[in-house]
């Protein structure tokens, strides 16, 4: 009985950590250079899972996505119902130029029809791009992303320490 009482705090702490990691926040490591210059290979991020769903997914959020057997980190560019295109390194949403207020690499021209053979992004789907556009494996190659495959939003960078803090979109 004394052993059970002595070990109970450890069991409760371990259970709490498992619950938090499973349902609230999860650490994720940036793999590759597709999000440069904003995120770098080896950066350690915290992904918020709880409360992140279709009602609060916003353009330019940095999200963790299940893509096959791996998790990838990309930026939300297109939302359901929108027509997206890039011309001369400018983002067009429903034929209007939209400023991207973050650092990204040159984007080759493309339009939504090349990605999904559709005029607008279907309900429950999102267009994502990496910030390092010339090398990123994103919606231009893998197609639109299902809402169910968006695991969470990257909210904090915890490594390297010199860049510790919120991830602003």
Cite the ranges covered by each PLM segment.
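Soluble "head" domains of membrane/secretory-pathway proteins
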Residues: 3-4, 11, 18-19, 23, ...
């Amino acid at each position: 009985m004394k052993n059970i009482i002595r070990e109970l705090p450890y069991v409760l702490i371990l259970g709490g950590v498992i619950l938090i990691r499973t349902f609230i926040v999860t650490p994720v490591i940036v793999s590759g250079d597709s999000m440069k210059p904003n995120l770098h290979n080896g950066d350690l991020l915290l992904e918020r899972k709880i409360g992140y769903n279709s009602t609060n997914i916003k353009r330019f959020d940095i999200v963790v996505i299940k893509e096959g057997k791996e998790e990838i980190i990309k930026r939300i560019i297109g939302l359901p119902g929108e027509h997206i295109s890039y011309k001369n390194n400018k983002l067009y949403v429903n034929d209007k130029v939209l400023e991207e207020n973050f650092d990204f690499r040159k984007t080759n021209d493309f339009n939504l029809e090349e990605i999904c053979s559709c005029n607008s992004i279907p309900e429950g789907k999102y267009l994502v791009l990496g910030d390092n556009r010339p090398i990123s494996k994103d919606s231009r190659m893998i197609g639109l992303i299902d809402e169910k495959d968006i695991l969470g939003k990257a909210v904090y960078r915890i490594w390297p320490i010199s860049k510790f803090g919120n991830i602003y979109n």
